[in-house]
């Protein structure tokens, strides 16, 4: 069992396999010159897997593959199969924009993937284009349909932005209702890599939009999830709200993150990280385990909003979210 320096059980590892993405979403990585990590600096699947085995052997039972856009990494299904074959009962999920799912969903399912978290910020082609800076909606919807068709579990994430897609909260939620998919509204998190003009909706504003049509009741958080859940009285549908500015989910935080070049990150809201790259490149399991232990010991107790270090509008970290998968 993995325990951090504040007595929390850590059993969830998020693994970024690439920082690259085929979208340029305004809240994450809008058009600008990027200093991509050279391909030769990325850890191989075998190197990533060596560390993941250490983590799984010591208590990790939930893994999410992220990016960037993870489906851009070649032979991702073989990596999924490595993980599944090593620990078939692992809760294995992937975060994606769904653009490449029409041609990859079946392979991912066959490899052992269980669930997908998919970003869907608009059902209007022109708004989806505005956010992603690419004509994406038709392909994304096909990807969602394909994922459901092959039997993958699906959750939808939406980032409501003022003046852009804030009038679609009910539309996107009802799209999910019709397909028995859970939606989670994610409050926009300020960062230096997003467009400066963006303004996100606060959690209470998102809930107010839902209340314009439905009666809702709070359910609370499920386990260590950062999502605060609600149910709709009229039909029993459940949805979630991830509101890092207001809801203190740090006390039950159970996750750490590994980047594609081997940095182990204890908290998304801080820059601190340690590299496991040297250890896994030489196959040193003991050293990799020691790095993991150090990161757990130094994992912050609370995020920086809760500590009062940040005021509204300030960024959480200089590290781009596309480097860590959020």
From Swiss-Prot:
Signal peptide: none annotated. Keywords: 4Fe-4S, GTP-binding, Iron, Iron-sulfur, Lyase, Metal-binding, Molybdenum cofactor biosynthesis, Nucleotide-binding, S-adenosyl-L-methionine. GO terms for biological process: Mo-molybdopterin cofactor biosynthetic process. This is GTP 3',8-cyclase. Catalyzes the cyclization of GTP to (8S)-3',8-cyclo-7,8-dihydroguanosine 5'-triphosphate. Residues 5-227 form the Radical SAM core domain. It comes from Sulfurovum sp. (strain NBC37-1). Belongs to the radical SAM superfamily. MoaA family. The lineage of its organism: Bacteria, Pseudomonadati, Campylobacterota, Epsilonproteobacteria, Campylobacterales. GTP binds at residues 14, 64, 95, 155, 255-257. GO terms for molecular function: 4 iron, 4 sulfur cluster binding; cyclic pyranopterin monophosphate synthase activity; GTP 3',8'-cyclase activity; GTP binding; metal ion binding; S-adenosyl-L-methionine binding. InterPro entries: Aldolase_TIM (IPR013785), Elp3/MiaA/NifB-like_rSAM (IPR006638), MoaA (IPR013483), MoaA_NifB_PqqE_Fe-S-bd_CS (IPR000385), MoaA_twitch (IPR010505), MoCo_biosynth_MoaA/MoaC (IPR050105), rSAM (IPR007197). Pathway: Cofactor biosynthesis; molybdopterin biosynthesis.
């Amino acid at each position: 069992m993995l325990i951090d320096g504040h007595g929390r059980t850590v059993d969830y590892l998020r693994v970024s396999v690439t920082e690259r993405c085929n979208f340029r979403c305004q809240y994450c990585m809008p058009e600008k010159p990027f200093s991509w990590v050279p391909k030769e600096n990325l850890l191989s699947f075998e190197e990533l897997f060596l560390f993941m085995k250490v983590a799984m052997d010591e208590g990790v039972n939930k893994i999410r593959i992220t990016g960037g856009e993870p489906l851009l990494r070649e032979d991702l299904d073989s990596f999924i199969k490595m993980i599944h074959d090593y620990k078939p009962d692992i809760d294995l999920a992937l975060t994606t924009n769904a653009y490449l799912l029409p041609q990859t969903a079946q392979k991912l399912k066959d490899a052992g993937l269980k669930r997908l978290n998919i970003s869907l910020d608009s059902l209007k082609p022109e708004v989806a284009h505005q956010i992603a800076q690419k004509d994406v909606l038709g392909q994304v919807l096909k990807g969602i349909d394909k994922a459901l068709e092959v039997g993958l579990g699906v959750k939808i994430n939406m980032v409501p932005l003022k003046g852009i897609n804030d009038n679609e909260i009910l539309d996107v939620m009802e799209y999910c209702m019709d397909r028995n998919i859970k939606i989670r509204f994610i409050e926009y998190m300020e960062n230096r890599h997003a467009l400066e003009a963006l303004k996100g909706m606060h959690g209470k504003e998102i809930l107010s939009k839902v209340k314009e049509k439905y009666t809702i009741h709070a359910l609370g958080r499920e386990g260590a999830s950062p999502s605060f859940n609600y149910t709709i009285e009229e039909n029993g549908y459940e949805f979630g709200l991830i509101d890092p500015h207001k809801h203190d989910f740090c006390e039950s935080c159970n996750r750490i993150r590994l980047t594609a070049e081997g940095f182990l990150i204890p908290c998304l809201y801080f820059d601190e990280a340690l590299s496991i790259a040297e250890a896994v490149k030489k196959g040193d399991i003991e050293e990799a385990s020691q790095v993991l232990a150090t990161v757990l010991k130094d994992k912050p107790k609370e995020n920086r909003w809760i500590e009062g270090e940040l005021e509204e509008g300030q960024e959480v970290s200089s590290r781009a979210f596309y480097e860590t998968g959020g």
